[in-house]
Amino acid sequence: MSEKSVEAAAELSAKDLKEKKEKVEEKAGRKERKKEVVEEEENGAEEEEEETAEDGEEEDDGDEEDEEEEEEEDEGPALVRAAEEEDEADPKRQKTENGASA
């Protein structure tokens, strides 16, 4: 009889161990899912904050610099054209400035 009780105890403990193992695995799975959800929420919030800050700052600074460069580029050829037009409009003045008679 003692052998049967030992075998029964071993069987129960094996079943108990199996059930406990399943419960532990279920709990671990739940914890992992919760962690993933929390991490996704945290990462999503952090990314949105970073994107908002970076986009706002970079766009403002970048636009101002681009506008200044465009204005300088636009002024350059216009000034050259204006000087050429003055030379063509006043040929007499050009000659007198060069030392030739008018």
From Swiss-Prot:
GO CC annotations, alphabetized: nucleus
GO process annotations (BP): immune system process; negative regulation of apoptotic process; positive regulation of transcription by RNA polymerase II
Biased composition (Basic and acidic residues): 13-37
Modified residues (N6-acetyllysine): 4, 15, 92
Cross-referenced InterPro entries: Pro/parathymosin
Highest taxon listed in the record's lineage: Eukaryota
Region (Disordered): 1-102
Keywords: Acetylation, Immunity, Phosphoprotein
Modified residues (Phosphothreonine): 52
Sequence ranges of Acidic residues compositional bias: 38-76
Coiled coil stretches, renumbered: none
Keyword Acetylation: yes
Residues modified as N-acetylserine: 2
Modified residues (Phosphoserine): 2, 5, 13
The keyword Acetylation is annotated on this UniProt entry: yes
GO molecular function, one term: histone binding
Function as written in the Swiss-Prot or TrEMBL entry: Parathymosin may mediate immune function by blocking the effect of prothymosin alpha which confers resistance to certain opportunistic infections.
Family: Belongs to the pro/parathymosin family.
Protein name listed in UniProt: Parathymosin
Organism (species): Bos taurus (Bovine)
Gene that produces this protein: PTMS
